[in-house]
C-alpha cells in the first residue's frame, strides 16, 4: 500500500474514537495534516505558479518581490510552536482548513491545495499591501508598534511579518470571506450586508430582489433584508419570501460556502401572521433556506405588560409610512394617531400575536427578536425620522440601510490566547491569568486587519457607498474557555467582572486605535462623523448610563478630547457575532456563549465528526473518565462529587437563561453594535408559552438590542453516541510510527513525543 493509503486507513480507524480518546483525536488530526501536506504547495515559487493566476496582480507582485523572505517566514512557521499547536487541535479543525478555507486545487491534473503556511501568507500579504498603500494605516501601525510594544517597523517586509504572526498564531481570526478570498482577484471580503429594498410595486420588488439582492448573494456573504415595506396589489408576502428563498437555494447549489438571507418585518405590519407562518414545519410551501426576524417597538411590550388582552392594530405600510421611520415616543404618537383615524387594516389581541411569535420560535428557532428602541437609542447617530428596523443575517450588526447597502467587515479575537500561565494550556490549574495587554495588542491588530479589508472592492455600487462609514465588527470566541481555565463558572461573580472588563478594554482599544489613524496617520474621519455622537464626546457606554470600571476615566477623557479634535476613522467597533465557522479552526468555544456541550458532533454531506470539548476533556481525571463517558459529558447528570469537580464545565442549557440575558446586559454598554444572543432552553422551559414570553419581556426591560438571535431547545432524550470505546493499541502504535516521519522534518528543539498541549476546544455566512 502507498503511504497515502496507510495514513488514510489510520485516520479512519482513529477518528471513530476521537470523541473520548484525546490522544486518538490529536493523532488523527496530525495524520490528516501530514496527508494533506503531500498534496499541498511547498515553496512560494510553486505556490505562485499554481495559484498566481487567481491572485490580484498587485498581491502577486508583492509576493514575487519578497519571495525569498516569505519562504523563510513560512519555513520558520512550520517549525514553530504556533504551527505545532494548530496541527494538534484534532481531526475536525484539520478537516475544516482544507474543506472550507484554503484555496483548493485549480485542476484535477495538478491537484495541489494551498498549504496552511501559504494560506496565512496570502492573507498577510493582502493586509500588508493595503496597509502600505494606505498611508494613514501604515503610519499609525508604525507609531503604535513603537510606542506601545517597543517594536520598530521600517520595511514593508516587517509589516508583512506583523500581520503574519498575528494571523498565523490565531490570536486574531479573520472572517470567513477574508480567509477564503483575501488577495484573490474579484472577490468580496465583507461579511455582512443589509438592504431595505423598495417593495411597493411588482416592478420595484423584482428589481430589488434580482438587481440588489442577487449580486450580494453571489459575493458569498450573508444579507439582512427589510421587508416591512412590502405592500401592493393584495399580494401575499409569502410569495416575496419564496422569491428570496429560491435565490438562496440557487446560490447554495453545489457551493462550498453556503449563504443565506434574514428577512425582517415590524410587528405592526398587516401580514405579520403570514410572515410568521412562512417557515412553520406544517406549512407545505415553507421557506426552509431563509431566516426571519421581527422588529418590535417598545409600545408593543409596554401595552402587553399593561394588558395582554388589549388590542394591537395592524397597518398596510402604504397607509402608515411614518411608522417605519420613527421609534420611541414619536412612534407611539404616530401609532395612536393612525389608530384614532382608523387607518388600520385589522386588530388582534396582544396575547394572540405574542403567542403566534412564540409558537414560531419554538417550532423553528426563530424569528430573531430585535428591539426597535434599543437599536436606535444606542446608535452612533440620532436616527429619529430614519429609524433602524432590521439587522443582518445573525442579528449582531446595527446599521441604517435606507439610502444604500449597509456593509460590515468582521474579525474576532481568540480570547484564550490572551491567557498567561506557566501551566496553560497543558492543564486547567486555576492559576491562569488574563493578559489585558495581549488583548489590547489583538484588538489593535484587528483594527488594522479590518481596515485593510475595507479597502477591497464591493460587489455593488450601493455597497461601496456603505463602506464609507467604515463599520467594523470586532468579536471574540473562547470566552467560556477563559473562564474555566481560570477556575470560574460562566455565571460566577468573578467571571462577570472579567467579562465586563474584557469588552470595556476591547471597545476602548478599538476606538483609540481608530482615532489614532486620524490623529497620527492623518486619515480622514468616516463619512458622517460630524453627525455622530462621538463627535460630541459621547461614547457608547454613556448612552447606557454605565460607568467604565477598568480603563481610568482620565484615559477616556483624553480619548474624548482627541476624537473631538481629530475625529475617528471608523463608525462602529464591537459586534459579537456567532463564530461557528472560525472557532472550529482553533477548537475553542463559539463566540461569547457558554459551552454548547462537552460532546457533540459536526455533520456534513460527507461524514460525521465527533467534536469533544477539549478544554473539558484534558481536565478529566483518569479515574473519572468512565463516569464522564457514561453521562455523555453532561456534568449536571453526574454524581455530586464528580459534578462538583467539573462544575466549571456546565453547558449553556444548565445555566439560567435569565442570568445569561442579564450578563449580556452587563457587557452591552461596550458592544456598540449588538450581540447574537442565543437562548438555550430545555423542553421543560417551552412546555408553555409563558416562559419564553417572560424572557422576551426581560430582554426588553434590560434594554437589549438583540433580545433573541436564535432559540435552541435541548431535547430530554438523546441518541446514543456511537463510537469505539477502546481503540486497538496497535492502531495508535502504527500511527505514531507514521508520525515519526513528521517529527524528523522538524528541528530538534521542536520534536516532541507528547501531543500538542494547545488542544482546546452551521452556518458560516457571517464568520
Swiss-Prot record:
Name the chemical reaction catalysed here: a 2'-deoxyribonucleoside 5'-diphosphate + [thioredoxin]-disulfide + H2O = a ribonucleoside 5'-diphosphate + [thioredoxin]-dithiol
What S-S linkages are listed for this chain? 192-408
Q: Does the keyword ATP-binding apply?
A: yes
Q: Give the site residues for Important for hydrogen atom transfer.
A: 192, 408
Site feature location: Interacts with thioredoxin/glutaredoxin:
763, 766
GO MF term (any one)? ribonucleoside-diphosphate reductase activity, thioredoxin disulfide as acceptor
Gene Ontology BP, a term: deoxyribonucleotide biosynthetic process
Q: According to the UniProt entry, what is the EC number of this protein?
A: 1.17.4.1
Which Gene3D superfamilies does the entry link to? Answer: 3.20.70.20
Q: What class of enzyme is it?
A: oxidoreductase
Could you tell me which Pfam families the record lists for this protein? Answer: Ribonuc_red_lgC, Ribonuc_red_lgN
The active site of this protein is located at 392 (proton acceptor), 394 (cysteine radical intermediate), 396 (proton acceptor)
- Which terms are listed as keywords in the entry? ATP-binding, Disulfide bond, DNA replication, Early protein, Nucleotide-binding, Oxidoreductase
- What are the site positions for Important for electron transfer? 709-710
Q: Which PANTHER family match?
A: RIBONUCLEOSIDE-DIPHOSPHATE REDUCTASE LARGE CHAIN (PTHR11573), RIBONUCLEOSIDE-DIPHOSPHATE REDUCTASE LARGE SUBUNIT (PTHR11573:SF6)
Q: How does it assemble?
A: Heterotetramer composed of a homodimer of the large subunit (R1) and a homodimer of the small subunit (R2). Larger multisubunit protein complex are also active, composed of (R1)n(R2)n.
Q: Can you tell me which family this protein belongs to? A: Belongs to the ribonucleoside diphosphate reductase large chain family.
- Role this protein plays: Ribonucleoside-diphosphate reductase holoenzyme provides the precursors necessary for viral DNA synthesis. Allows virus growth in non-dividing cells, as well as reactivation from latency in infected hosts. Catalyzes the biosynthesis of deoxyribonucleotides from the corresponding ribonucleotides.
Q: What is this protein called?
A: Ribonucleoside-diphosphate reductase large subunit
Origin organism of this chain?
Answer: Saimiriine herpesvirus 2 (strain 11)
